From Swiss-Prot:
Stored Pfam families: ATP-cone, Zn_ribbon_NrdR
Zinc finger (unnamed) boundaries: 3-34
Co-factor(s): Zn(2+)
Keywords: ATP-binding, DNA-binding, Metal-binding, Nucleotide-binding, Repressor, Transcription, Transcription regulation, Zinc, Zinc-finger
Protein name (Swiss-Prot/TrEMBL): Transcriptional repressor NrdR
One Gene Ontology term of the molecular function aspect: DNA binding
PROSITE patterns tied to this protein: ATP_CONE (PS51161)
Species the sequence originates in: Cereibacter sphaeroides (strain ATCC 17025 / ATH 2.4.3)
GO annotation terms (biological process): negative regulation of DNA-templated transcription
Span of domain ATP-cone: 49-139
Amino acid sequence: MRCPFCGNIDTQVKDSRPAEDHVSIRRRRFCPACGGRFTTYERVQLRDLVVIKSSGKREDFDRTKLERSIRIAMQKRPIEPERIDQMISGIVRRLESLGDTDIPSKVIGEIVMESLARIDTVAYVRFASVYKNFQAADDFDKFVSELRPTAPAEE
């Protein structure tokens, strides 16, 4: 593993243990060249997923990009980081289990929205505002009004 401080490719693993999510391994590494210490995480990847964008462009699935967008939606929400990590791992497992390596971005967005809706409504609305490309306050109003349960009709 290349040292992020000096670029040396000969680093040593000093400690290795399961991460808190139990789907990855946390490794503490040491660089003998510069003395730097850093942490890496190793995860199982069942298959290489390819995202098909709405424009038709294809790009490799990037877990980090997915994680970043979810963490932005969850920012300053009272959700434990471990819960977010579990949700992200669950989304990735679900994508890998779809049986196809080519996944439309729309499918990924819908799965993320389903997961967020179960955990935090505010994060769900935040993510939806970007995913559905809200342009005005009316877009928010319409979306939020669809979330509210309707009162039963009076007879």
